[in-house]
């Protein structure tokens, strides 16, 4: 993904302002609520029967934290997303058999969560830069599928 120096600065600056652990859990939870078919990949997470059950689920929050920490790795390696996510791409393709479209969906949900958490600081320029990043991450995670 190609980002200008200004875009990289926006992404790293905005990401540094959020509570990574919280936004990860919120983003994954919202994904599971808004796109309920994605729940099939999380059978071991227990009660996913309602929005409140999902958003309060400790396993959703814990996995969301892992996802967000992975995004932190990507933010630190914006020039090498493919390499950064190579092992995760292999895991999600070969072992977990996750539909790669779900990576794009989660990225879009994450952008919404960032907007909610950052408010006016999340400018249109920051949103556009983050959209590039989450698309780049989704593409890198889907790489093994091709």
From Swiss-Prot:
Keyword Phosphoprotein belongs to the record: yes
S-nitrosocysteine, modified sites: 93
Record PTM N-acetylvaline, positions in chain: 1
Domain Globin positions: 2-146
Tissue expression as described in the entry: Red blood cells.
Gene it is expressed from: HBB
Similarity remark: Belongs to the globin family.
Coiled coil residues, start to end: none
Protein name: Hemoglobin subunit beta
GO CC terms of this entry: blood microparticle; haptoglobin-hemoglobin complex; hemoglobin complex
Modified residues (Phosphoserine): 44
Keywords assigned: Acetylation, Heme, Iron, Metal-binding, Oxygen transport, Phosphoprotein, S-nitrosylation, Transport
Modified residues (Phosphothreonine): 12
Complex formation: Heterotetramer of two alpha chains and two beta chains.
């Amino acid at each position: 993904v190609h980002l200008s120096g200004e875009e990289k600065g926006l992404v790293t600056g905005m990401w540094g302002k959020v509570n990574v652990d919280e936004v990860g859990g919120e983003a994954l939870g919202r994904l599971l609520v808004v796109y309920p078919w994605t729940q099939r990949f999380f059978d071991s997470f227990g009660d996913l029967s309602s929005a409140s059950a999902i958003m309060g689920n400790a396993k959703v929050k814990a996995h969301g934290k892992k996802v967000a920490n992975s995004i932190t790795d990507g933010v630190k390696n914006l020039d090498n997303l493919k390499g950064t996510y190579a092992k995760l791409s292999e895991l999600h393709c070969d072992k977990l058999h996750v539909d790669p479209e779900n990576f794009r969906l989660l990225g879009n949900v994450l952008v919404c969560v960032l907007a909610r958490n950052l408010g006016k600081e999340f400018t249109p320029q920051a949103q556009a830069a983050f959209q590039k990043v989450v698309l780049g991450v989704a593409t890198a995670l889907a790489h093994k599928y091709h």
